[in-house]
Amino acid sequence: MISQKGESYPASITSSLNNIFAHHGVLGGSVVTIDKNGYHSFYYGDAFPDSIPFTDSTFLRIASISKMFTGMALLQMVEEAKIDLDQDVNTYLNFTLVNPSYPNIPITLRMLLNHTSTLQDSRSILTMAKRTIFRDSLNPNHSIPDFSELFINGNSHFLPRTIKTEKGKISKVIPGSYFHYTNLNFVIIAHIIERIEQQPFHVVIKKRLLDRYAIPGGFIVQEIPEQGTLSPQYLLKGNTWIPEADAYTVPYDSIFTSIKDYVPGRNVLRFSPQAGLRVSSMGLARFFRSFLSDSKMSTIKTMMFKSSWKAKSDNNSHQFDNLFKEWGLACHIISEKQESFAEDFPWIGHIGRANGAFTMMYMSPSARKGIVIFINGKRKQSKGSIGFESIEKDIMNVIFNKHWRKE
């Protein structure tokens, strides 16, 4: 029987990983891999500075990997014929979403899932997110704004009609073909999920996905089990680790009391569907191993893993240092050599970056392999919007070229 906790890596691999985490000045983190031999895991440092160690019971807000769960729930609803990927998204909304530069091209759910909607993350979205996501801890006396208020002047959320490329060429920003990675896409998806299911988003994800494979965690902190430890996301300022999110010193229920009165469709930013899933690294690995093996999810996997956008010189914003060459639905696809990814294509997954935390999860459906990396706080800060972090590259080199090469 395959261990659910995971075996330790061989001493040489553990030593290499320890050296990498130490070299990059990591506060706490983990590496978990899945393959034909089951799970292997590595844990490093602290969940809280000089206090509680980072272990298999440490839960972390995993940033944008969360989008895969939001996308999976929507695709389940597509399979159930509750929704149509290629229908004008306004069919499902209580506000109007039209690109003013291309009013005759309807924005669809498929475009939201593969980031070709031509939406962008505007300042007004960030302002509403802060008022909503951290309402209890930062703005306890403020009411949650209605999500539709964001779209009173909806045109501000779209990219301009044309953009100049890195080589000076003018590129048309056409819905359905131009890729621009945008958090707002998945907030709108989650809003639609709530409107159709008439349940809070966190409940939908729990019932449809996490409970299916008995994975603890969720999109609200109350869903973390009593034996789990929620690690805040940390940034180093000076020589002090500063918690940027999920830093709670009192029981969760005494902070998040208003969640009980939440009305589905009010403002799904409450659950941060683009970034707010809290789960352990082993839990995340277990989820995707179960997902790969689940024959009843075959239609979902087919829809997700099928290529729906490929990069050209003029059809994307070249974000994250040109990391994204291909996209499925709610997932990044790597189908050719890139860093340590050199075989077992395609690799399906996502990166996450938020408040000092760096996460990634990639899996090879054909080889039944996968890798999960959690980095929470590091002394060597990157500048700009880069692709894979140097520490992620170092870790992947050890796993792909030493650990898996021995199989």
Regions found by a protein language model. Name each.
Residues G6-I62, I163-S171:
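Short, conserved catalytic-motif segment at the N-terminal edge
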Residues S8, S12, S16, F69, ...:
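Extracytoplasmic/secreted proteins, especially bacterial periplasmic and envelope-associated proteins
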Residues H24-S30, D50-L112, I170-N185, S272-A275, ...:
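Short active-site loop at a secondary-structure junction
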Residues D46-P49, S295, K378-K380:
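A short acidic/small-residue loop/turn micro-motif
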Residues S101-F345:
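Short, surface-exposed loop or secondary-structure junction motifs
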Residues S293, F305-N316, E336, R379-E407:
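Short, gly/Ser/Thr-rich active-site loops of penicillin-recognizing serine hydrolases
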Residues P346-S364:
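Low-complexity, glycine/alanine/valine/leucine- and proline-rich hydrophobic stretches
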Residues F358-S364, R368-Q381:
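Short, well-ordered beta-strand elements
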